Design a protein with these regions (language model features):
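Terminal amphipathic alpha-helical/low-complexity segments used for targeting or macromolecular assembly
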Residues: 1-57, 62, 193, 199, ...
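Glycine-rich hexapeptide-repeat left-handed beta-helix
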Residues: 18-19, 113-115, 120-223
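Short amphipathic alpha-helical segments with coiled-coil-like heptad repeat character
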Residues: 32-36, 90, 142, 184
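Short gly/ser/thr-rich secondary-structure transition/capping motifs
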Residues: 46-49, 63, 119, 159-161
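Glycine-rich active-site/cofactor-binding loop and its immediate structural neighborhood
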Residues: 60-62, 66-105
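Surface-exposed, flexible loop/turn segments at secondary-structure boundaries
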Residues: 72, 78, 90, 108, ...
Length: 223
């Protein structure tokens, strides 16, 4: 069993309006099937003076900036001061936190983005949770389904965890940096304050406070 990549170790629950709900789960992949019900529960209690309901089960903060060309399907919450840019494609089951950026031609599906998270340029993020201030460089994507369509298994060295999920993208801890054009394979988990080099192909778990160059070159950060 994987021990070092619990939700509590990866993210600050105070940095998402879903934090209290996520505390109910030990591992992040346990929460993925429940994102829709979390959004619906939160949406019903959002204050009308700060949020407006646009369409069925879509709540958008009045302070958020949403470009006219963006497509948003419910259930979805766009929290305060978030920016949904040109031609963003939000397919539903998406919670976009305070001050987040969802950029040009980016696609989201079944995700929670913690506050200040940025997916600003041509990113695909599906069946994933991205932590506070996590950033995905231009063109970096999450791959959320295996080519053989079997359930995703999360690997950490010799340890592993059966998720029971056919679809799981990536879990990024707070302050994670993903380099441009990287691919995060199904079941990737990246710890807090870890940097991934551009053009990387990542799978499995990467510990917090590391620099990932490739599978054979993962170095601990030194301050």
């Amino acid at each position: 069993m994987i021990k070092d990549f619990t939700l509590e170790q990866l993210v600050d629950f105070n940095e998402s309006i879903a934090g209290d709900y996520l505390k109910e789960y030990t591992y992040p992949w346990e929460a993925l099937p429940h994102i829709e019900e979390i959004i619906l529960a939160i949406g019903k209690s959002l204050p009308e003076d700060r949020f407006e309901k646009r369409g069925e089960n879509i709540w958008i903060a009045k302070s958020a900036v949403v470009f006219n060309s963006a497509y948003i399907a419910g259930p979805c919450i766009i929290d305060e001061d978030a920016e949904i840019r040109q031609c963003a494609f939000i397919r539903g089951k998406a919670l976009v936190g305070k001050g987040c950026v969802v950029g040009n031609s980016c696609e989201l599906k079944n995700v929670i983005l913690f506050n200040k998270c940025e997916v600003p340029h041509y990113n695909y993020v599906g069946d994933s949770i991205l932590g506070f201030h996590a950033h995905m460089g231009a063109g970096s994507i999450t791959s959320n389904i295996k080519s053989d369509r079997t359930n995703v298994v999360v690997h950490d060295g010799e340890d592993s965890a059966e998720t029971g999920l056919r679809k799981m993208g990536a879990i990024l801890g707070d302050w994670t940096e993903i380099g441009c054009n990287s691919v995060l394979n199904p079941g990737t988990v990246v710890g807090r304050h870890t940097n991934v080099y551009p053009l990387s192909m990542v799978r499995g778990c990467i510990a917090a406070n590391h620099i990932y160059k490739d599978r054979e070159h993962v170095a601990e950060k030194h301050t």
